[in-house]
Each structure stands twice: as structure tokens, then as C-alpha cells.
From Swiss-Prot:
Keywords: DNA-binding, Nucleus, Repressor, Transcription, Transcription regulation
GO annotations of cellular component type: chromatin; nucleus
Single GO term (MF): RNA polymerase II cis-regulatory region sequence-specific DNA binding
Gene that this sequence comes from: ROX1
InterPro entries hit by this protein: HMG_box_dom, HMG_box_dom_sf, SRY-related_HMG-box_TF-like
Species in which this protein is naturally found: Saccharomyces cerevisiae (strain ATCC 204508 / S288c)
Protein's name in the database: Repressor ROX1
Annotated region described as Disordered, given as residue ranges: 100-121, 242-273
Pfam family, one: HMG_box
SMART domains named among the record's database cross-references: HMG
GO BP terms, alphabetized: cell differentiation; cellular response to increased oxygen levels; cellular response to osmotic stress; cellular response to salt stress; negative regulation of transcription by RNA polymerase II; positive regulation of transcription by RNA polymerase II
């Protein structure tokens, strides 16, 4: 029975294959039951009968076609108003989609009715709860985990800060050496931002009083660097001149001031031109900031990187006062090459006083 119409559904008239299938289906089941064979599924039985139908002779098929014609005439006599109206699959799908859409619309209407039926006074209260939850999630917590996460985020933000490279004429450290191209120039204004490479250093603002200005200069010169560690021996401290006798002490990373107030020994990273400018300070017009105390470590870091690229063997020559020919590219003389395992070593182990050139082989350790 069709629920939309009260009239029963009229079956279609049987064709030749359906009549043939009904006939042989009964025969096969009777044979299998007599033999005690398990009866297969109807789909398999239809395949067996289909192969037999294709293998029939045209004369045998004509018999079943005649039976189908008689079946059709009998069907017309019983149902004279019958007309075959096939329903396409697309229409079936469309009907299913329409039914699904109708069900969804009904559910939405029911939900809207339920929301409207609720009292409207509860809405501001619920909104306040949501705002309180958000504020609680954004408030700083006193737990250790939240403080650690905040510190970690702060450290990452500090690491992402750019290191400025200002190339000005005011107290700029000249670091260009022949045969040793260095990476960048720094000014005294840039040093407080180099926390990843340098230790804490004093930085003073420019006072207007000349007496306090000299006081700051003397304090900055005499103050040693905190937490200083032994670094790679500076090459200029190993060999001064070929005529001089070797000294058995090494240079450390600290910078000391001389007794004279007008002259003081700056770090090896500063040039001779800078030392000349130190001697010609005018109290009324110019002010010189404190010397760059950690510049030795910077220079040794760049020196280590350059020596690492050149290889484990390098040549040291006597240096002039201008520090221009730091490394030599000449062919080394064939002498015994001692090995330097540590940083602080006696100089008589590596210096050959009879020659002007000294070849040394060292295991470099990166300065911290």
C-alpha cells in the first residue's frame, strides 16, 4: 500500500527472463535439497540462472517470449488503466534531500521556540559570567609555572631584539685589520644591548661638570670587569719585537689604567688613532665616554672565528705599534710545531728567538 494514495500498487507484467528464472529456481532448489547440498544465496542463484539464459538457443528463448506475451495480455485485462511511469534515481535523491531539509528546519524552529520561552533576565547574568571567566584567564597567576612561562617569554623577546650597527664618527672602535675582515662596528651606545656576548659593563651619562667628568673617566678605567674568565692569549702579547726577549707572563682579559691622568691604556680593540684622541681631550668642548672594557673579548671572539676558518695552523709575526699586520700570509718556515693544549701557557714554549717568524699550532677554544 502506498501511504500517499489509497489504491494498491499495481505490479509490472513479467518478462521472459523473469518467467524463466522462476521456473529454474524451483528446479535447482529441489535438486539441491535432494542431493543434500547447501542452498546458496539468491544472488548466486540469479547468476547461475543468468548464465543458463545466455546459453539457451533462440528456439528455447522464443518459448519463454511467447509466455511473456500471454502474461502481458493477461495484465492488460486485469489492469486496463495501468501505465508504466518509471521514477528516476535523481528524483528519489531530491525527495530524500527535501525530507532532510524539512527535518532540519523543524529542529531549528523548535530550538528557537525553546530559546524564546526562556526568561530574558538570565542573559546579562550569563554575559557577566563569561566576562569574569575571560578576566580570570588573563589575570597573572601566582603559581611557579606561570612565572616560569612569563620569564621564558620575556627571554625570547629580549633575544629577538635587533643589535644596531651605527657607523658614526663619535667614539667608534675601528676594527678593520688587514687579512682579518671583521663583521661589524660598535659604539659605546650599542654596548648595553649586547647582553648575549658581553658581561655587565658600566655606562655613564655625560655630566656637565669637568671635575666629575674626569672622576667618571678614572672610575671607569680602574674598574675591572666582573666574572672575567681566562681567554685565548692575545697574539700581540706573545711577540712584541724580534729583538726583545720573551716574557713568561700572558695577557688576561682585564684592562688596567696607567698612573697618568691624561694617558691610559685602552683595550687592544681600540686603535692608535683612538689613543691619540684620548690625549687631546678638550674639557670645554669634547667629552669622551669610558673605554670599552670588554672589547678584548669581542676581538678574541672574531679572532677565533677567523682562525677557525683558516685551520689549526697559523703564523705569528712581530707586530708594529699600528697593529695592521696581525696575521701573515707568507709561506711558513719548516720548524718544529709545538702543540698548545691550554689557553694560558709559558711563552718560551712557543717562541723561537733565533727566527723572526714563529709557527704555532693550537687547539682553539671558543671564548664565552
Amino acid at each position: 500500500m502506498n501511504p500517499k494514495s489509497s489504491t494498491p500498487k499495481i505490479p509490472r507484467p513479467k518478462n521472459a527472463f523473469i518467467l524463466f528464472r522462476q521456473h529454474y529456481h524451483r528446479i535447482l532448489i529441489d535438486e539441491w535439497t535432494a542431493q543434500g547440498v547447501e542452498i546458496p544465496h539468491n544472488s548466486n542463484i540469479s547468476k547461475i540462472i543468468g548464465t543458463k539464459w545466455k546459453g539457451l538457443q533462440p528456439e528455447d528463448k522464443a518459448h519463454w517470449e511467447n509466455l511473456a506475451e500471454k502474461e502481458k495480455l493477461e495484465h492488460e485485462r486485469k489492469y486496463p488503466e495501468y501505465k508504466y511511469k518509471p521514477v528516476r534515481k535523481s528524483k528519489k535523491k531530491q525527495l530524500l534531500l527535501k525530507e532532510i531539509e524539512q527535518q532540519q528546519q523543524q529542529q531549528q524552529k523548535e530550538q528557537q521556540q525553546q530559546k524564546q520561552s526562556q526568561p530574558q533576565l538570565q542573559q546579562p547574568f550569563n554575559n557577566n559570567i563569561v566576562l569574569m571567566k575571560r578576566a580570570h584567564s588573563l589575570s597573572p597567576s601566582s603559581s611557579v609555572s606561570s612565572s616560569n612561562s612569563y620569564q621564558f617569554q620575556l627571554n625570547n623577546d629580549l633575544k629577538r631584539l635587533p643589535i644596531p650597527s651605527v657607523n658614526t664618527s663619535n667614539y667608534m672602535v675601528s676594527r678593520s685589520l688587514s687579512g682579518l675582515p671583521l663583521t661589524h662596528d660598535k659604539t659605546a651606545r650599542d654596548l648595553p644591548q649586547l647582553s648575549s656576548q658581553l658581561n655587565s659593563i658600566p655606562y655613564y651619562s655625560a655630566p656637565h661638570d669637568p671635575s666629575t667628568r674626569h672622576h667618571y673617566l678614572n672610575v671607569a678605567q680602574a674598574q675591572p670587569r666582573a666574572n672575567s674568565t681566562p681567554q685565548l692569549p692575545f697574539i700581540s702579547s706573545i711577540i712584541n719585537n724580534s729583538s726583545q726577549t720573551p716574557v713568561t707572563t700572558t695577557t688576561t682579559s682585564t684592562t688596567t689604567a696607567t698612573s697618568s691622568p691624561g694617558k691610559f691604556s685602552s683595550s687592544p680593540n681600540s686603535s692608535v688613532l683612538e689613543n691619540n684622541r684620548l690625549n687631546s681631550i678638550n674639557n670645554s668642548n669634547q667629552y669622551l665616554p669610558p673605554p670599552l672594557l670588554p672589547s678584548l673579548q669581542d676581538f678574541q671572539l672574531d679572532q677565533y672565528q677567523q682562525l677557525k676558518q683558516m685551520g689549526p695552523t697559523y703564523i705569528v709575526k712581530p707586530l708594529s705599534h699600528t697593529r695592521n699586520n696581525l696575521l701573515s700570509t707568507t709561506t711558513p718556515t719548516h720548524h718544529h710545531i709545538p702543540h698548545i693544549p691550554n689557553q694560558n701557557i709559558p711563552l718560551h714554549q712557543i717562541i723561537n728567538s733565533s727566527n723572526t717568524e714563529v709557527t704555532a699550532k693550537t687547539s682553539l677554544v671558543s671564548p664565552k
